[in-house]
Amino acid sequence: MRLSTNILSTTLAGLTLLFACGVSQGADTNKGRQLYATNCAICHGPTGRSVMPGAPNFDRGEGLLRPDFTLLASIRSGKNAMPAFQGILPDRDILDVIAFLRTMH
């Protein structure tokens, strides 16, 4: 019984990790590039090098070590000077931007 519980726990943990990391599968990085240029580059820079103090430098991977669902929540809600994009961009578009960001470094 104990072995079955351990196997089940390990399987559930693995599936949770798999789904958490795989949110952007099938994302459109070209669309993400266009959305980034329109909505993000003014502060984060056209190449990902921040032009606004406090904004992460995506060209160095800053802030991109978090899973997609965490980044999605951050972009939806905004932070400090960054506006919230919930209601402005649909989640699919935000995930396209995240996928594009991951290609920058």
Language-model features and meaning:
Residues 57-105:
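Extracytoplasmic electron-transfer domains, predominantly the class I c-type cytochrome c fold
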Residues 18-35, 70:
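Electrostatic cytochrome c docking/interface patches
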Residues 9-20:
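Bacterial N-terminal signal peptides
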